[in-house]
Amino acid sequence: MANLRITLVKSLIGRPETERKTARAMGLKKLHRQVVCPDTPVTRGQVQKLAHLVRVESIE
């Protein structure tokens, strides 16, 4: 199963609470921090919600 490397590239300051909570749930706390998550529908939904704030790379 593939994984996704997700990097927070824009600040969460001034963002709605739901976006901040989603980023926090994914483990993204500070700018330019990376997390590796499994490529599941749940993760894809979270990435879609934060698409304007994160960079996503597929890794194997």
Swiss-Prot record:
Organism, as annotated: Moorella thermoacetica (strain ATCC 39073 / JCM 9320)
Gene Ontology cellular component list: cytosolic large ribosomal subunit
Lineage of origin: Bacteria, Bacillati, Bacillota, Clostridia, Moorellales
Gene Ontology terms describing biological process: translation
InterPro entries tied to this protein: Ribo_uL30_ferredoxin-like_sf, Ribosomal_uL30_bac-type, Ribosomal_uL30_ferredoxin-like
The family this protein is said to belong to: Belongs to the universal ribosomal protein uL30 family.
Short name of any one Pfam family annotated for the protein: Ribosomal_L30
Keyword annotations of the record: Ribonucleoprotein, Ribosomal protein
Record's protein name: Large ribosomal subunit protein uL30
Subunit description: Part of the 50S ribosomal subunit.
